[in-house]
Amino acid sequence: MTKLTEDILWLSQKLEALRPELKIISISAKANDSFFVNSADSNTRLIAKQDIGEYRLEPMLQIAQSEYITKPQIFEIITNAQISKTEQKISSEFLIHAIGLVFAEANYLLHSHSTKVNKVLASKLGAKAFRGHVFEESVIICGKNPASIKFAESGYQLATAIYRELSSFQKIYFHLPKILLLENHGVVILAKNPKELITITKTLELWAELIYAAYQLGGPNYLSLDNVMNIETENRSTQNQEKTTIDKNLSEK
């Protein structure tokens, strides 16, 4: 069993505590030119070793950047991209993982249908409700700006929409998001390591819960833009200080 397979199994176990509100669809982890992902039909239980397959990234990226492609062609390419031949059920949603892992420069990705988040995303406000922060941890952990996508059908259409949004987001904000909010659908969490993925997921669940509750009492009291900027600046300064201290300690050894 590879380390990345172990990481996916570990994440499945740790995120189990958030069920049933957090419906885990799939978790992936990136290797060099490939990625590991669990099958779409394992989302009602803990992920098992046999649910996980390895796929080459490049063929998936070519699909996402194609102007036109048929469903049979998509499934043929995904099937041929499989490295570890298993009985795993092939899904066009694997494209989401390939695009997120590569173009968002993430190492781990969680796609979920969170009830708490979807209560907000399925409303008239949709992802706009997350344009403001109601507590400082969401700024620090989830990032100042989550990315969002209007409803798109699962598979190829959603994958290409994610590709376009990531490209646009980076041009506007000069960085990549940690969260993709999929209106009337769910969430994609993008992380550098397994622990960060769990922390972002838990914080987003709380953020959504607070926003939903606040609208029952007249609406959220969002932090001001100055508040958010100050929190972000202070957090960046703290991270830089910690990195400097670590580098200094390593150089003295």
Residue positions per predicted region:
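Glycine-rich flexible loops
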Residues: 1-253
